[in-house]
Amino acid sequence: MKIIGIDPGLRNMGWGVIAVEGPRLRHLDNGIVHSEAGDLGPRLAALYRGLCAVIVRHAPDAAAVEQTFVNKDALGTLKLGQARGIALLAPAEAGLEIGEYAPNAVKKAVVGVGHAAKEQIQHMVRFMLPGVEFAGPDAADALAVAICHAHHLQGRALRIKASA
């Protein structure tokens, strides 16, 4: 199974694709879809086209998107929410199952604690996906989201197996 993790952002939308082979995880690719400064509509369109191209190229079986948090900058939060809408729309249009995870849930799944620093997350992603080179911090976060979803799916499969 291939999973694409997405870290929504208006300037940089990180993505990472992993393969889940039983209990093993394998890095396939990661990158960042960029949007240039300017009017919001064209920026969102660029993010959408870029993310759709990644989904077509890698043909994942499932997607995972990090949930956003509200901060003091209401306008910034609103714009980030619109970018998150793109992060949900592109895989939904491709017919993918989408998991959504809070940042603390991603950190807990990857590091073991919900308030881990970015450096700790990147260290554990490198440990879980040996040889990975990050296209940037947003791509590293996206891989962490994909790993979180893989763990969720593996746990769900075990629960189904146990109840059968």
Swiss-Prot record:
Q: Which residues are noted in the entry as Mg(2+) 2-binding?
A: E66
Chain sites annotated for binding Mg(2+) 1: D7, D138
Stored Gene3D superfamilies: Ribonuclease H-like superfamily/Ribonuclease H
Q: Which GO terms describe its cellular component?
A: cytoplasm; Holliday junction resolvase complex
Q: Please list the GO biological process terms of this entry.
A: DNA recombination; DNA repair
| NCBIfam families attached to this UniProt entry | ruvC (TIGR00228)
Q: What does this protein do?
A: The RuvA-RuvB-RuvC complex processes Holliday junction (HJ) DNA during genetic recombination and DNA repair. Endonuclease that resolves HJ intermediates. Cleaves cruciform DNA by making single-stranded nicks across the HJ at symmetrical positions within the homologous arms, yielding a 5'-phosphate and a 3'-hydroxyl group; requires a central core of homology in the junction. The consensus cleavage sequence is 5'-(A/T)TT(C/G)-3'. Cleavage occurs on the 3'-side of the TT dinucleotide at the point of strand exchange.
Q: What is this protein called?
A: Crossover junction endodeoxyribonuclease RuvC
Q: Which organism is it from?
A: Paracoccus denitrificans (strain Pd 1222)
Gene that produces this protein: ruvC
